[in-house]
């Protein structure tokens, strides 16, 4: 990757660091803040096709619970949101006008996601989890195990029931196969809400 590409991406992330108050970790190309065992990260990705004429960037927002393992691993992520540029995956920051436009977009997005959620957890941990359950469950792909751990099964049960109701007959058959030892689907091997439902006898 050329020096221009690296410098442009570094400038983009550093400006977002200033706008959000998140720490810029250059080695990970990420923004990070921590409250106790909760780690908030915005991870940036760049296209392998980037060159001086086209610089594409994208980002994911992740919330990790260090009680479950190191941050940003399959074991510890409890909520996440990917940013999508309509039909295109990459956001183009190749020239000044595009750079400024996409910077403004991400400043707005991160204020309503990463900054807002950090502030909520900083103010009231349990209330922030309740907010994830009630307002942002689908948008942030929130994990059941975390919500049950913090809020209790009774509080989270309506979301679990909603999840089960939306399963297709094929999904239910795969859960039955998993209980008999099948390991041919990604969710059977990794932590997921389907895995949680199957392992805890909800179906």
Name each model-derived stretch.
Residues 1-6, 32-203:
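Intrinsically disordered, low-complexity regulatory regions enriched in serine/threonine/proline
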